[in-house]
Structure formats: structure tokens, C-alpha cells
Amino acid sequence: MQNKIIIHGARAHNLKNIDVEIPRDKLVIVTGLSGSGKSSLAFDTIYAEGQRRYVESLSAYARQFLGNMEKPDVDSIDGLSPAISIDQKTTSKNPRSTVGTVTEINDYLRLLYARVGTPYCINGHGAITASSAEQIVEQVLALPERTRMQILAPIVRRKKGQHKTIFEKIQKDGYVRVRVDGDIFDVTEVPELSKSKMHNIEVVIDRLVNKDGIRSRLFDSVEAALRLGDGYLMIDTMDGNELLFSEHYSCPVCGFTVPELEPRLFSFNAPFGSCPTCDGLGIKLEVDLDLVVPDPSKSLKEGALAPWNPISSNYYPTMLEQAMASFGVDMDTPFEALTEEERDLVLYGSGDREFHFHYVNDFGGERNIDIPFEGVVTNVNRRYHETNSDYTRNVMRGYMNELTCATCHGYRLNDQALCVHVGGEEGPHIGQISELSIADHLQLLEELELTENESTIAKPIVKEIHDRLTFLNNVGLNYLTLSRAAGTLSGGESQRIRLATQIGSNLSGVLYILDEPSIGLHQRDNDRLIESLKKMRDLGNTLIVVEHDEDTMMQADWLIDVGPGAGEFGGEIIASGTPKQVAKNKKSITGQYLSGKKFIPVPLERRSGNGRFIEIKGAAQNNLQSLDVRFPLGKFIAVTGVSGSGKSTLVNSILKKAVAQKLNRNADKPGKYHSISGIEHIERLIDIDQSPIGRTPRSNPATYTGVFDDIRDLFAQTNEAKIRGYKKGRFSFNVKGGRCEACSGDGIIKIEMHFLPDVYVPCEVCHGRRYNSETLEVHYKEKNIAEVLDMTVDDALVFFSAIPKIARKIQTIKDVGLGYVTLGQPATTLSGGEAQRMKLASELHKRSTGKSLYILDEPTTGLHTDDIARLLKVLERFVDDGNTVLVIEHNLDVIKSADHIIDLGPEGGVGGGQIVATGTPEEVAQVKESYTGHYLKVKLQQ
């Protein structure tokens, strides 16, 4: 096999007919500015062709379900291996998908518990074992010689009644003696039993002395006892000891039964093992009392009950007033001062007790009736589940939250699965082991106490689990738990988890294509990620990694720099070679940063802010250890720390939600904290995340930033438009009139693929131009509206330079480094980083109040160092206007540019959640306990 992947004539997207050679079995980094064509080369050319060739190798029957994969725009690719893409966009949002299911560790855990687990009675009656008649005989014969015993068949266990028919049947079957409540009676002389008391009844099958020659008789008696006792028997050894046996997995004391242990019992995605209350989700949608009574200091008359606010309707407040008068509850007493009984009445209703309700509505309709009082919680639940109105359901949903299931306590499984332990009764059940962090899980596997037989069975299973956990640990995910929902993971976390699955497969000869695996990873953990990538390479695989991290680039075997610019100014191979060769290439911007010729300078001075703070006290959500944190306003703040240290919990779960709740009346409940102050110093909260700017191809940069309204105004003012009577709406692709009706102005037709992702194809009528031919006959400066939407931001800036209102808005898009995108580029095709910068652009042209709080979570995702320099200038513009910018970030160039750092740690998970250091970058760099400070010190000295 040749030792290179040779590509000729690649033209996907902005690639300019490039030729490139990529060494096989090496770690190859593809880098370049955002939009330069890196992903077009790695994913849309190399991976797409590898996938297409694989599909073509399948049978015609299999191909009919996959459809024809379009050949990428490339002349030829030689030396291609089977390709596996590990990107950041394919994270499952299904609530049933967890870290354990994605990595397949759960499959091995289920097998482990099915093979070496022991069930224990949930009522505390010890281990539950299943024994055959032969095993029971062997255990009885092992008793001391001359032991006197009687074999009993339990037929009534803790049941009320006189049980006369049972005694008649025992006599009819030919048995002579019974034991009733511990006393032996002749079956014909049993005293009359009390109807109202619980009774135990056992039939005496045989009486024996343990000695040679009794095996045959004992075996017959045991079989008879099991038959009569429905699989249970008791051995009474006459000296007061009793042995309980069962041929089922069933507790002989209370009857708690466990089915045969098999892997499906431990799956929360199968009805056999899932919790019957929450169906294996671990959470239930329940009414949240904190949302129903947001301010307990208010009285019922003052509107303490949010769902029954008199603003929307007077019906429920009237009912409440009349009910409380009837039941003697004071409406003027603060809710928190009501007795527990009174609060229960208000929340959950009066049960069967009725009150007289009289109500006249606005139309004169009258209700005069004696009814029970429903209670506000019961009312919200009923209206949510019974209404046919989406509006009402959404309103009621605002008073509900996903709370931990009270039946399974969040473990997702039923009692039969959770009663099985490994390593004795003190060992964990499968739910508990899934709640451990990866690091603790590894330690538990080392300390697991198994019998010799169990160890032999468990050894290959434990090895598979250990290998996968070790890799997760090695890529900085030691703080995650197997029960963590996949939908809550960041892009970088989910990608590294899928890497763990691939390393576990031990494949060789594969082409892996990765998209920025270092995202969300602290510098401390980056070296371990690089080692893991090298391990995959050493197995005989080729790794093509789209990456911007300088450390990763310097450790690569080969570097390909795509550029020189973005969009139509990119798409060329600027440099290709070893990192040292690229660093010497004067044409390569990447090379200039690697060699140190270009760099992001450290600010000459730090801003002092406006002297005000937002202060959170007692932040205790997830792993946060009751933190008191001050966020200085009027500064550029960076929240840092190793992965899992609590950054997102502090900023996104507590600060952002608490501020949104106060400023925007947001119903999203913040995480646990004691108090927050200083929100009055800000007027707006702007969350600039990486979610799409629109979920359909109709949304694009022009519509999102609002510049399209101005462009449509301009077209409506042209002479041709006035002659035809066209107004502004004629140039909208969202309403009838000027748009192409064949595709409803989308320019593309969606083809539903059912169980595959939907496919979009260009409209055959308008050929993707969105408008009908009459609309396209109107021109401004010889361009029609469709041609304007096809312009890049850079071209549009020149085209509209004479129209300041339009040029100003387009300039903001260029300022955030998106000069290469087209005005009409569908929002669905923008990356997370591009969407985030588009949101920044839309904020830039708004008039600043100087009292805004901007929150950004890892804004450097997908950005080259040159793009980061541009991003920092934009963020600094916000701060210079008096606003506060808060970023969660690992990138040292951003961290060193901040005015104030809040460093969390010291570790991830349970080892984190503390403030390790705060202050300027220079101050944090001096804190020895801070991992961030350690790397920052080096960066500040460069």
C-alpha cells in the first residue's frame, strides 16, 4: 500500500482546484483561518469520498436505504482508507443517551452485574439465592452429623384469615402435621385462628436425622417440599436454627422476587429493567413549588400563588378567596407564616371537604356549587395534562421542572435491578457505580472484592471497562460520570468521549478525521490528549485533525496550512510540511504565529472597572462548594479552570439564569445559591452562545443583523420598482408576491428521509435564487436582489459603500472576521463559532447603554489565533463602552488579555468547585496552586 493519500483537483466550496499529499499513518494537522477551507478539505472532500466509496462497496439492497452519496468535487484521491469522522455536531440530545451508553461501558457493566452480581432483599433480609433441589440436598448433608431436622413447606406467609380451606387441602393431600405461627399441630387439631391477625403456616414434609444413607429420602422430601411450597422450603434443625431455601430468586421471608439475572435487567432503555415511574429517564416533570410560590413572604391576597395571578383571570383568585374563608385560612398572612396544614390545603387541596363556590363571569354566566377545593399544585398538574390548548400547556409548563424521580432516586432502574450488588452487600449497585466520577470508578475497579470464581468470570469484562475508563481519564474527562446525559456535554467533551470508543475498538488501518478535539480542554490536560492521539496513530491509523491549538500543531508529524484568507480569499495550500518547516514559511500566517513573529500582545494596562459588582453568595450547585464570588463590572472577566471545575455551573447555571430571572422574568430556575446582589447595576443581559442563529435555511446573516430590511427598502425605491408598484414586501422571500412559490422562497426543497437526516436539493424553478423572474428584473447598480444575497460581506461592503446605514451594519459582520460569508448564506450552514460571531455583529451596531453584561462560553471555538486577535478587539470595544464582558475560556491569549480572572479548581468534579485564584493575569500567575496560573506565567513572559 502507498504511504501517502494523494489528492488532485479538490474544488469543494472555496477550495481552488488544489493538489495535496498527506502522509499515511501520521498525525496530520489541518489549520488556517476560519472559513479558509480546512473543513472543506478534511470533511467535505477526504471524509466524503471515503464514506462514498464505503457505501458503494455495499450491496444494492443496503444502498437503497442510504441513497446515492454525491461524489465530492475532486478529480482523484488515491491511497484512501476507510474513514471515520469524529466531529462536534453529532452529539445525541436524546435524554436516554448517556456517557455510559455512548462509550458502551454500560453494556459491559450490565454484563458484569448479570454474571457476578448478587441480589439482596430490599427489605433487609439478606442475599437472595436460587438453589436447585440437588444443591439444597448438598447443603443439608453438610450439616453436622446426627443433626435432627424437619423439612417444612411454607404455604402461607404473613396473611390474615382463618385459612380453613388450606388445612382441609393439607389433610386431603395426606400430610399429618403443620406448623402454625411457630407451633407444631396435628392437622386435625389446629386451633381456630384469628381473622384479623397475620399467620404463617408450614406443612411438615419429613423429620430426619443427618446420617449416612438418607440422601435418597432427603432428595424426595426436598422435591416434595419445593413442589408444595411453590419453590420454597425451610429446614428447621430443632436447635432453633432455620435455613431458608428457594429455587427462585426470591426472598423466603417477604417474598421479594428478582427475575433471572441477565444484561437486559440492567438497561434503563428496556421495559424489563427501567423504573416504571419515570420510564428509565431518572427525572419526572413535576410542579416546582419555588416557581408556584416565587415569593413566600407575600400573602395569598398579595398574589403569592403565581399560577393564579388575577391579571390573567379572576376565576381562580375568587375561588381561592371563598375556599380560604370557608376553611378558616387568613388571606393576609404571608405564605411562609401559614401552618403546615394550611399550606398543604392551599397547595394540594381539601380532599373530600367541600366549600360553597359562587362565581359570575364577565358575560353574566353564573356558577353556584358545593365543590372540594382543588389546590394550586393539583390544578397546575391537571391543566397541563388535560388541556387541548398549546398555550395553556406552555403556561403550565412554566411552573414545572424536571425533578429527580422519587421512585428510583434518579438511578433510572427498577428495584429488581438496583437490589443486585457486586462485591458483597456493601458493594455498589449499578446505579451507584454509574454516579461515580471516572477517576473514582477506576479506583473502585482496583478495589473490587470478588471470590476466585467471580474474578475468573469478571476478568475480561473488567478489562474492557478499565481500558475505556482509562482513556476517558487520559483526555481530561476524569470528572464525568457514566450517568451524565449526552445532551449536556460540550462539543469538545462529546468528541473526546467518541474518541474513547474508537480507542477501545483497537482498529488499525483506519483514517480518522477529527474537528478540534482540544475544545474545552485546559492546557494541563492537552498533553494527555495529544498522547492519546499518538497512541491511535501508533496502532497504524492516519489521523487528520482540524486544529488551531499551537501545542497540538507543534507535536504533529505533518502540518497543512490552508489560506491565505477566508472564503473566496482562501482555499489554497499555503504551507505543507513538518511544524518546523511551516514555522519558517513567510507566506503562512500560522507559521508566523508558531515562530513568534506574530503574536497577540499583553495589554499595557488593566481596566479598573466602574467600582460596582455582582456578588453571588453560597453558590452550591453540582460540585460548587458554597462559593462567594464577586464579578467586577465594567471589566473584561475570564472564568477559568480545568475541565469540570465548575465554570459552566457558576456562570451558565447560576449567574446567567439568576440575572435573566430578575431582568427578563425568565422562568428558567437558577442553580443553588444563597443570595445575589448588584443586578440593579446592569440593564441588559446578552448571552452570546454558539447555538444556531436560525434553525431553517430562511435565516441568514442579512436577516439576522437586520440589514436585509434596509436592502429591501433600497430596492423598493428604485425607479423600476416604483413603475411596477413594488413595495418593500415584494423583495421578501418570506411572503407571497415576489418569492418563488415552488419552494416558498427557500431556494431549496426539503426531501424527508424518514429515519435518515433530511436532504435539501436546489429548487428546479428558481434554481436556488428564491425569487420569481419578475422580481429579479428589478436592479440596483446592475444587481438584482438574489445577486446581492450571493455577495460576500467583503463585496457587499464595497457595493453599498455609498449607503452609510447599510454599510455600517455590514461592517460589523466584517469586524468579527466574517467577511467571507455571503449575505444570504443559510444559517444552518454556519458553524457554532460563526453563529456566535454573527450574534456579536448584531450587538455591535446597536446603541450601547454601557450597562450590559455579555456572557460568552468558549468564544474561541473554531478560531485561528489571527481570528482570536480580531475577536479580542470586538470584545474590548464592548468593555470600552462601559459594558461588562464575561467569558468562560481556556485559550491563554484570551485569558492574558482579561482585566480580571476567576480561576476555579483545583481539579475537576468533586475535586473542584473552589476558587483557586482571582485578580489580574499577573496576580493569578503568581498563585502556585493554580494550574491556569502556571501556564499563564509562561505565556506572559513570551
Swiss-Prot record:
Subcellular location(s) of the protein: Cytoplasm
GO biological process: nucleotide-excision repair; SOS response
CDD domains (UniProt xref): ABC_UvrA_I (cd03270), ABC_UvrA_II (cd03271)
Keywords: ATP-binding, Cytoplasm, DNA damage, DNA excision, DNA repair, DNA-binding, Excision nuclease, Metal-binding, Nucleotide-binding, Repeat, SOS response, Zinc, Zinc-finger
GO molecular function: ATP binding; ATP hydrolysis activity; DNA binding; excinuclease ABC activity; zinc ion binding
InterPro entries (alphabetical): AAA+_ATPase (IPR003593), ABC_transporter-like_ATP-bd (IPR003439), ABC_transporter-like_CS (IPR017871), ATP_grasp_subdomain_1 (IPR013815), P-loop_NTPase (IPR027417), UvrA (IPR004602), UvrA_DNA-bd (IPR041552), UvrA_inter (IPR041102)
GO CC annotation, single: excinuclease repair complex
Domain ABC transporter: 308-589, 609-937
Record bears the keyword Nuclease: no
Keyword Nucleotide-binding: yes
PROSITE patterns the UniProt entry points to: ABC_TRANSPORTER_1, ABC_TRANSPORTER_2
Binding sites annotated in the UniProt record for ATP: 32-39, 641-648
Domain of life: Bacteria
Zinc fingers (C4-type), renumbered ranges: 251-278, 740-766
Chief location of this protein within or outside the cell: cytoplasm
PANTHER family (alphabetical): UVRABC SYSTEM PROTEIN A
Record's subunit section: Forms a heterotetramer with UvrB during the search for lesions.
Family: Belongs to the ABC transporter superfamily. UvrA family.
UniProt function note: The UvrABC repair system catalyzes the recognition and processing of DNA lesions. UvrA is an ATPase and a DNA-binding protein. A damage recognition complex composed of 2 UvrA and 2 UvrB subunits scans DNA for abnormalities. When the presence of a lesion has been verified by UvrB, the UvrA molecules dissociate.
Matching HAMAP family: UvrA
Protein name as annotated: UvrABC system protein A
